Protein backbone atom coordinates (compact mmCIF):
# COMPACT_ATOMS: atom_id res chain seq x y z
CA UNK A 1 0.00 0.00 0.00
CA UNK A 2 1.36 3.40 -0.99
CA UNK A 3 1.97 6.23 1.45
CA UNK A 4 0.67 9.54 0.18
CA UNK A 5 0.78 13.28 0.92
CA UNK A 6 -1.82 15.38 -0.88
CA UNK A 7 -1.65 19.17 -0.96
CA UNK A 8 -3.95 22.07 -1.60
CA UNK A 9 -2.27 24.54 -3.96
CA UNK A 10 -3.06 28.23 -3.35
CA UNK A 11 -1.91 29.31 0.08
CA UNK A 12 -0.38 25.90 0.77
CA UNK A 13 2.33 25.21 -1.78
CA UNK A 14 2.60 28.78 -3.04
CA UNK A 15 1.62 32.34 -2.22
CA UNK A 16 -0.57 33.19 -5.21
CA UNK A 17 -2.74 35.95 -3.77
CA UNK A 18 -1.33 38.96 -5.60
CA UNK A 19 -1.69 37.43 -9.07
CA UNK A 20 -5.29 36.43 -8.31
CA UNK A 21 -6.04 39.98 -7.15
CA UNK A 22 -4.38 41.44 -10.24
CA UNK A 23 -6.43 39.15 -12.49
CA UNK A 24 -9.55 40.34 -10.72
CA UNK A 25 -8.63 43.99 -11.21
CA UNK A 26 -7.84 43.47 -14.90
CA UNK A 27 -11.20 41.76 -15.31
CA UNK A 28 -12.97 44.64 -13.56
CA UNK A 29 -11.15 47.15 -15.76
CA UNK A 30 -12.29 45.40 -18.94
CA UNK A 31 -15.97 45.45 -17.97
CA UNK A 32 -16.06 48.89 -16.36
CA UNK A 33 -16.18 48.01 -12.67
CA UNK A 34 -14.52 50.82 -10.72
CA UNK A 35 -13.67 48.86 -7.57
CA UNK A 36 -10.05 47.74 -7.25
CA UNK A 37 -8.84 44.93 -5.03
CA UNK A 38 -5.92 45.78 -2.73
CA UNK A 39 -3.39 43.36 -1.31
CA UNK A 40 -3.67 44.15 2.40
CA UNK A 41 -7.43 44.60 2.38
CA UNK A 42 -8.60 41.88 -0.03
CA UNK A 43 -5.95 39.17 0.09
CA UNK A 44 -8.29 36.89 2.02
CA UNK A 45 -10.85 37.03 -0.79
CA UNK A 46 -8.37 35.56 -3.25
CA UNK A 47 -7.96 32.44 -1.10
CA UNK A 48 -11.61 31.64 -1.84
CA UNK A 49 -11.06 31.50 -5.60
CA UNK A 50 -11.84 33.40 -8.76
CA UNK A 51 -15.59 33.53 -8.36
CA UNK A 52 -15.28 35.04 -4.88
CA UNK A 53 -12.85 37.60 -6.28
CA UNK A 54 -15.43 38.59 -8.91
CA UNK A 55 -18.21 38.69 -6.33
CA UNK A 56 -16.20 41.12 -4.21
CA UNK A 57 -15.85 43.52 -7.11
CA UNK A 58 -19.54 43.34 -8.03
CA UNK A 59 -20.63 43.79 -4.42
CA UNK A 60 -18.43 46.80 -3.82
CA UNK A 61 -19.28 48.40 -7.16
CA UNK A 62 -23.03 47.70 -7.35
CA UNK A 63 -24.02 46.84 -3.79
CA UNK A 64 -25.31 43.44 -4.85
CA UNK A 65 -24.10 40.24 -6.54
CA UNK A 66 -25.61 38.91 -9.77
CA UNK A 67 -24.63 35.22 -9.74
CA UNK A 68 -25.34 34.82 -13.44
CA UNK A 69 -22.95 37.68 -14.15
CA UNK A 70 -20.35 36.00 -11.93
CA UNK A 71 -20.62 32.84 -14.05
CA UNK A 72 -20.46 34.85 -17.27
CA UNK A 73 -17.33 36.69 -16.12
CA UNK A 74 -15.51 33.66 -14.74
CA UNK A 75 -14.12 32.41 -18.11
CA UNK A 76 -12.83 35.93 -18.82
CA UNK A 77 -11.19 36.02 -15.40
CA UNK A 78 -9.47 32.67 -16.07
CA UNK A 79 -8.10 33.81 -19.43
CA UNK A 80 -6.71 36.97 -17.86
CA UNK A 81 -5.35 35.03 -14.90
CA UNK A 82 -3.39 32.71 -17.19
CA UNK A 83 -1.49 35.74 -18.52
CA UNK A 84 -0.40 36.90 -15.05
CA UNK A 85 -0.40 33.54 -13.27
CA UNK A 86 3.23 33.65 -12.15
CA UNK A 87 4.02 37.36 -12.20
CA UNK A 88 4.26 37.42 -8.40
CA UNK A 89 3.42 33.88 -7.25
CA UNK A 90 6.19 32.12 -5.35
CA UNK A 91 6.69 28.87 -3.49
CA UNK A 92 6.60 29.17 0.27
CA UNK A 93 9.98 28.83 1.93
CA UNK A 94 11.08 25.21 2.21
CA UNK A 95 8.40 23.84 -0.12
CA UNK A 96 10.81 22.57 -2.77
CA UNK A 97 13.00 20.85 -0.18
CA UNK A 98 9.91 19.29 1.42
CA UNK A 99 8.74 17.84 -1.90
CA UNK A 100 12.22 16.50 -2.62
CA UNK A 101 12.31 14.83 0.80
CA UNK A 102 8.98 13.12 0.26
CA UNK A 103 9.94 11.86 -3.20
CA UNK A 104 13.27 10.58 -1.94
CA UNK A 105 11.45 8.68 0.81
CA UNK A 106 8.94 7.02 -1.54
CA UNK A 107 5.94 9.07 -0.45
CA UNK A 108 3.71 9.69 -3.45
CA UNK A 109 2.43 13.21 -3.93
CA UNK A 110 -0.79 14.69 -5.24
CA UNK A 111 -2.56 18.04 -5.50
CA UNK A 112 -6.25 18.51 -4.72
CA UNK A 113 -7.24 22.11 -5.46
CA UNK A 114 -10.30 24.18 -6.26
CA UNK A 115 -8.29 25.93 -8.98
CA UNK A 116 -9.33 24.57 -12.41
CA UNK A 117 -6.95 21.83 -13.52
CA UNK A 118 -5.68 23.72 -16.57
CA UNK A 119 -4.61 26.69 -14.46
CA UNK A 120 -3.23 24.39 -11.75
CA UNK A 121 -1.06 22.60 -14.33
CA UNK A 122 0.16 25.89 -15.77
CA UNK A 123 1.04 27.32 -12.36
CA UNK A 124 2.79 24.18 -11.10
CA UNK A 125 4.88 24.08 -14.28
CA UNK A 126 5.75 27.77 -13.94
CA UNK A 127 6.78 27.17 -10.33
CA UNK A 128 8.95 24.22 -11.39
CA UNK A 129 7.26 21.56 -9.23
CA UNK A 130 4.75 19.89 -11.56
CA UNK A 131 6.91 16.78 -11.98
CA UNK A 132 6.76 16.00 -8.25
CA UNK A 133 3.08 15.11 -8.41
CA UNK A 134 1.62 11.84 -9.60
CA UNK A 135 -1.85 13.35 -9.90
CA UNK A 136 -3.31 16.86 -9.96
CA UNK A 137 -7.04 17.22 -9.36
CA UNK A 138 -9.18 20.32 -9.82
CA UNK A 139 -12.92 20.87 -9.42
CA UNK A 140 -13.43 20.04 -13.10
CA UNK A 141 -11.68 16.66 -12.79
CA UNK A 142 -14.65 14.98 -11.11
CA UNK A 143 -17.19 17.79 -11.61
CA UNK A 144 -17.25 18.70 -7.93
CA UNK A 145 -15.19 20.90 -5.65
CA UNK A 146 -13.94 20.79 -2.09
CA UNK A 147 -15.39 20.53 0.56
CA UNK A 148 -17.07 17.64 -1.24
CA UNK A 149 -14.75 14.76 -0.27
CA UNK A 150 -14.98 13.07 -3.68
CA UNK A 151 -11.96 14.84 -5.26
CA UNK A 152 -9.76 13.94 -2.29
CA UNK A 153 -11.00 10.36 -2.01
CA UNK A 154 -10.58 9.75 -5.74
CA UNK A 155 -7.07 11.20 -5.59
CA UNK A 156 -6.20 8.77 -2.81
CA UNK A 157 -7.69 5.85 -4.72
CA UNK A 158 -5.82 6.74 -7.92
CA UNK A 159 -2.56 6.83 -5.97
CA UNK A 160 -3.17 3.31 -4.67
CA UNK A 161 -3.48 4.44 -1.07
CA UNK A 162 -6.05 4.37 1.73
CA UNK A 163 -7.24 7.11 4.07
CA UNK A 164 -4.96 5.67 6.76
CA UNK A 165 -1.90 5.89 4.53
CA UNK A 166 -2.62 9.48 3.50
CA UNK A 167 -2.21 12.98 4.89
CA UNK A 168 -3.88 16.05 3.42
CA UNK A 169 -2.22 19.45 3.82
CA UNK A 170 -4.17 22.69 3.47
CA UNK A 171 -4.71 26.19 4.81
CA UNK A 172 -8.47 26.84 4.71
CA UNK A 173 -11.62 25.74 6.42
CA UNK A 174 -12.65 24.25 3.08
CA UNK A 175 -9.60 21.99 3.20
CA UNK A 176 -10.37 20.99 6.76
CA UNK A 177 -14.01 20.19 5.98
CA UNK A 178 -12.89 18.11 3.00
CA UNK A 179 -10.51 16.05 5.10
CA UNK A 180 -13.09 15.68 7.86
CA UNK A 181 -15.70 14.34 5.46
CA UNK A 182 -13.15 12.00 3.90
CA UNK A 183 -11.81 10.95 7.34
CA UNK A 184 -8.27 11.75 6.23
CA UNK A 185 -5.67 13.12 8.70
CA UNK A 186 -5.37 16.86 8.12
CA UNK A 187 -2.31 19.06 8.57
CA UNK A 188 -3.24 22.74 8.91
CA UNK A 189 -0.61 25.03 7.46
CA UNK A 190 -0.46 28.10 9.67
CA UNK A 191 1.28 30.45 7.25
CA UNK A 192 -1.18 30.12 4.35
CA UNK A 193 -3.86 32.52 3.14
CA UNK A 194 -6.72 30.78 4.89
CA UNK A 195 -5.41 30.87 8.43
CA UNK A 196 -3.99 34.38 8.17
CA UNK A 197 -6.95 36.06 6.47
CA UNK A 198 -9.98 34.00 7.47
CA UNK A 199 -11.56 33.23 10.81
CA UNK A 200 -10.27 29.76 11.60
CA UNK A 201 -10.48 27.59 14.69
CA UNK A 202 -7.05 25.99 14.79
CA UNK A 203 -8.24 23.52 17.42
CA UNK A 204 -9.96 21.61 14.60
CA UNK A 205 -6.88 19.43 14.16
CA UNK A 206 -3.96 18.45 16.39
CA UNK A 207 -1.62 18.73 13.42
CA UNK A 208 -0.46 22.34 13.02
CA UNK A 209 2.53 23.22 10.84
CA UNK A 210 4.36 26.54 11.04
CA UNK A 211 6.90 25.59 8.36
CA UNK A 212 7.51 23.13 5.55
CA UNK A 213 9.92 21.20 7.76
CA UNK A 214 7.15 20.77 10.33
CA UNK A 215 4.92 19.33 7.60
CA UNK A 216 7.59 16.67 7.07
CA UNK A 217 7.82 15.90 10.79
CA UNK A 218 4.05 15.65 11.24
CA UNK A 219 3.62 13.52 8.12
CA UNK A 220 6.18 11.03 9.42
CA UNK A 221 4.45 10.99 12.80
CA UNK A 222 1.04 10.27 11.26
CA UNK A 223 2.10 7.69 8.71
CA UNK A 224 4.41 5.83 11.07
CA UNK A 225 1.33 4.77 13.03
CA UNK A 226 0.29 2.59 10.13
CA UNK A 227 3.28 2.00 7.90
CA UNK A 228 6.89 1.17 8.65
CA UNK A 229 8.58 2.74 5.65
CA UNK A 230 11.20 5.04 7.20
Name these PLM-found stretches:
Residues 146-176:
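Conserved Lys-Pro-Asp/Glu-containing loop-to-beta segment of HAD-superfamily phosphomonoesterases
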Residues 1-7, 224-230:
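Non-catalytic pre-domain segments flanking phosphatase-related domains
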Residues 206-214:
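Short acidic-hydrophobic, aromatic-tinged amphipathic segments that line or gate anion-handling sites
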Amino acid sequence: MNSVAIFDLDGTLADTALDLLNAGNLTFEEIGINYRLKENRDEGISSKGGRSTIRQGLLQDNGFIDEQLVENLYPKFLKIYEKVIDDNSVLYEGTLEMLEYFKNNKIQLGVCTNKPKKQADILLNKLGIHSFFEIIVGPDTYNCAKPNPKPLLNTIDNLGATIKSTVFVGDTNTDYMTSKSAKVPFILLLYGHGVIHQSFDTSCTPYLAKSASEIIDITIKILKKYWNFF
